[in-house]
């Protein structure tokens, strides 16, 4: 706990407000994210395709593979001159490696030119055109464009359209690329919006990232601003960079390509504004530090950062406006040492300028300025209810404890008065949490009251035993009085043992047994009452019911004894034996159903037994009919 004499301290806790009018980036590649992405791309080559993803992906991040000569040798040794895909991977990979030249034959050139046909898929056309471009070979751009347009009309998938954009970026600027450029607007219309924050294709992250990379590469090539709104760019960015771990090389490659496109294009460069660390600055150096970067966390050191205004959240009063940040290394600093901020929350409106490509360059930062609370003018009084005796007042200085004890009974009340001030500015404070806690030294009983300020911000707590006996359960004794001060903007929350107070209640109100009122004791265990079973009927009723059930069987035996049982026609043919065994089994199944099975299980078994018994019984009766006819 700090004393009132402690030095002034501002604690700044910064968050970017989500409720601002302009959409701000919620996901981007932090420096650890960039390193993780780099590690995902920097893998041993297993094929020419994997080499392409690694080499070109790392190149998008501004990094070369560790061993360029070894990578170039791998490309040459794995190149298949008769395969368009292999030529594409080799051409694009060698372009990203310094000093890696690959020579190809005329037959290979003819193979690539032949692949630029409307009979080829869009993927094959893209790979052939990009390979020709990578090897520096001439190409009839208008013919390639015609083949691409014709084939695209047959393949209307999102990925095929994205590959058409990638293909067009390798064609001559003299070709009429408007039909391909118009596809961008159609693709934007096919994007799915999620919660107003994310924008992506249902095909997934990889396709979305490739679309962003292809769009800006083509627009830089033709010199036209893409038909994508700024908010849509931020939504695409949020969707692409929301994933930090990548399942495949191709996915990591697509994210790296999108990041490079959003960081280095001629039209839209999203700005990321991040408070640096968790600042804790003294009054002599009250500084707000901001990192201003692109999506790859690369500092925008040429930017200009300005504070439009700073407003108190509570009063909405403007306390600072039109102030520039100072660039210091890779960060921008705002020194508000000369501004007397009272504790609380402030909304800082910050704008980044210096390049007309910047988007999402206006952000709102919520700044919490903490201070230290001081307790002054603490008076403890005992006031006679009849006012026949002058109040006895004792002043206490924090953090000391008052000497002696104070008495509150049926004749006199106890009162506590105090004020709370900002030790840095001297201004009065009204924290959110101001409690008086009374702790019974003998039983551990605790009673907590809220201290409220009056119109002059003087806090008062008065204890009248006749009015408060319910809270105390009329339990007399010596109570320790604690003062609790807390608030989110306070650097030094206070728990102060102020004094001992003897509270006396009338003996007739005292409880027979004083129980602890500790708020943190376990609750009484809940005993669950189960429903009592219904009474069984008398034994006579049960026996009578059983006799009635068995009476048909007894009647059967009696009739057999009187008229005789005709067993002369019983045969030991298989059908006869199976029929009677099946009938007995069904009766046994009824018993098992009663004791163990449910209805559905019983029906399943009954269907099997019944079918066998039916067929056997039918056969048995047929044999009996034949026997009678013969006689």
Curated annotation (Swiss-Prot):
Report the membrane topology from the UniProt record: Multi-pass membrane protein
GO cellular component term of the entry, any: oligosaccharyltransferase complex
Q: GO:BP terms for this protein?
A: protein glycosylation; protein N-linked glycosylation
Family statement = Belongs to the SWP1 family.
Provide the cross-link position: Glycyl lysine isopeptide (Lys-Gly) (interchain with G-Cter in ubiquitin). 154
Q: Where does the protein end up?
A: Endoplasmic reticulum; Endoplasmic reticulum membrane
Q: How does it assemble?
A: Component of the oligosaccharyltransferase (OST) complex. OST exists in two different complex forms which contain common core subunits RPN1, RPN2, OST48, OST4, DAD1 and TMEM258, either STT3A or STT3B as catalytic subunits, and form-specific accessory subunits. STT3A complex assembly occurs through the formation of 3 subcomplexes. Subcomplex 1 contains RPN1 and TMEM258, subcomplex 2 contains the STT3A-specific subunits STT3A, DC2/OSTC, and KCP2 as well as the core subunit OST4, and subcomplex 3 contains RPN2, DAD1, and OST48.
List the lineage, top down.
Eukaryota, Metazoa, Chordata, Craniata, Vertebrata
Glycosylation is annotated at 106
What name appears for this protein in its UniProt entry?
Answer: Dolichyl-diphosphooligosaccharide--protein glycosyltransferase subunit 2
Residues in the Lumenal compartment per record: 23-540, 593-596
This molecule's function is given as:
Subunit of the oligosaccharyl transferase (OST) complex that catalyzes the initial transfer of a defined glycan (Glc(3)Man(9)GlcNAc(2) in eukaryotes) from the lipid carrier dolichol-pyrophosphate to an asparagine residue within an Asn-X-Ser/Thr consensus motif in nascent polypeptide chains, the first step in protein N-glycosylation. N-glycosylation occurs cotranslationally and the complex associates with the Sec61 complex at the channel-forming translocon complex that mediates protein translocation across the endoplasmic reticulum (ER). All subunits are required for a maximal enzyme activity.
